[in-house]
Amino acid sequence: MNVLILTAKYGMGHYTASISLKQELENENVQVEVVDFFDIIFPKIKTLIYSVFNFLISKCSNIYNFFYKFSANSNFAPFNKIIRKRIEKLITESNANIIISTFPVCTKYISTYKKNNNKKLKLYTYITDIEANKEWISEEIDMYFVASNETKIQIMENGIPKEKIKVVGIPVRKEFKEEICIKDKNEIVVMGGGLGLIPDMDKTLKILMRNEDIHVTLLAGKNQKLFNQYSNKYDNMTVVGYTDEVYKYMKKAQLIITKAGGITLFEAIHSKTPIYIMPPFLSQEIGNAKFIEKNEIGVVVWNKSENVSDDIIQLLKSPDKLEKMRENMQMLKDRLEKTNVVEIYGEEIITVC
């Protein structure tokens, strides 16, 4: 069986989920290819598109949120003959039995292609945040793999039958799902995703580092400026650049301070590491943060004026509270359906036969 996973590098979350999904499917002896969809449909302006995105989320989040909400209510995708031919060439060369989308733009374009050119194409989509807006939805999708029951309800409210929705969480590397090592007392991981972006953290870290019994591992991602800023600055801090071994640091930590990204959320859940969320400012992050609060698996700072450092220190001194958060994470894990696209595809083939 051949599987083609289409994604995009808006941040690193969607791409990371795709690589994790590839790892999972290859364990089922499936041939899997992960493709940045923007390499295919917009090869000449891809770099510009990503540069604008990175600028907006770091400097102009209000403008980003405006465009996010606009696209959330639209299934429009500019589709012309050139784009159709590029998609057709990709699908033909991949010889894929299944196409999986982990990014809504991919979902829009492949749904349009399927509707107009190839009704038999199997199209599955993995939604990589708790909130599922309309840009993820299409009648051409054969199966939705979603993060939570909350996501499932949102999909059903858009007219999708529950039989086409599987609650499996968001894909993470298998290492996050393996047995958890003993947590290190007062170990904190600070990370802002692959781009290493957490605004206004300097003051908080400065106060935390005054406590010699606290150790912080700062995962700077691809943010070289952040890496250089904190390298060798504090004796009780370890700074790590971009790494594929986030699980090593997260699984031994008592707490992770981070943004409310969907991938990081489920990495923390599988690691049973309580989450401390700095003020969420992107629309999809707000939905993830509300999920964290509702399920009591972490703390969300909504107001920038809050005394974050003192709050973190008090949380580390509250083992019962941290243990309760870990128990809630385990309950969320237990609710996830144990299935994947290979099993679903096999069931559909049997049904057709």
What are these regions (language model features)?
Residues S20-T92:
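Conserved N-terminal ligand/cofactor-binding loop architecture of enzyme catalytic domains
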Residues K115-V167, V172-E175:
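Active-site-proximal region of nucleotide-activated glycan assembly enzymes
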Residues K162, E175-V190:
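Nucleotide-sugar donor-binding and catalytic loop/hinge architecture
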Residues K183-K252:
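Donor-nucleotide binding loops and adjacent catalytic segments primarily
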Residues K251-G261:
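Acidic donor-binding loop of glycosyltransferase active sites
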Residues K294-E296, K304-K321:
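C-terminal "capping" alpha-helix adjacent to the active site of nucleotide-linked donor transferases
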Residues Q314, K321-R335:
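A short, well-ordered alpha-helix in the C-terminal region of glycosyltransferases
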Residues R335-C353:
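C-terminal alpha-helical cap of glycosyltransferases
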